Amino acid sequence: MQIKWFGHSAFMVEAASLKLLIDPWVSNPLSPASPQEVAAAKPTHILITHDHFDHLGESVDIAKATGAPVVGTYELTLEVAEKGIPEAQTMPMNIGGTIKLGDGVEVYMTPALHTANRGAPSGFVIATPEGTVYHAGDTALFRDMELIGELYDIDVALLPIGSVFTMGPREAAIAVQLLRPRRVVPMHYNTFPLIRQDPEDFKARVEAVTRAKVYVMKPGDVLKL
């Protein structure tokens, strides 16, 4: 398994024969790649946590270019269908549900404490034969993260730390205690001034109270398991 960060909340998770592109706002100011370059990498699926501009991003254009199915809440898949994605190219689901993508890869949709233009915000647990990844989406800290950690043996947690619109470093460090992942990658910070944070502060907080290893990635970096 490998996980590539494009800045903000955009990642490509590669496991088995699949390439899962998550929240592809790859035109963000930190991204090392253009939407065209990301499409050329041929993602097999596009997962969207909610429909705010910085998460929906270029998902429609990339889906049109690649034919990759779009995974999201029912309301979100209706929204991308209105933008020209065929209904047959969408995979609607809802919080608490699981879908199988093939090659032993399953996606479980988690709740997120946030807002959305349509439908509910969410996160994803991606369980694969090579490891399990939790992408929290945009969220505040919530106690049921402990249940997510009990349900899934999380190898990597991708957590927002920007504050203002999501939890900040202090709350995200508590989230790590609840989730009990082996590794943590901070996201959704320093893309613009309102969410400026020091990821090293988050790293110090987490590693002082848990056994999790924090990886402070730079946009374009790849984490291999």
UniProtKB/Swiss-Prot annotation:
Molecular function in Gene Ontology: hydrolase activity
Coiled-coil stretches: none
Keyword Hydrolase carried by entry: yes
Domain of life (superkingdom): Archaea
Keyword ATP-binding: no
SMART domains with a match to the protein in the record: Lactamase_B (SM00849)
InterPro entries the UniProt entry points to: Metallo-B-lactamas, RibonucZ/Hydroxyglut_hydro, UPF0173, UPF0173_UPF0282_UlaG_hydrolase
Keywords: Hydrolase
Record-stated family: Belongs to the UPF0173 family.
NCBIfam families: PRK00685.1
Protein name: UPF0173 metal-dependent hydrolase Pcal_1074
Species lineage: Archaea, Thermoproteota, Thermoprotei, Thermoproteales, Thermoproteaceae
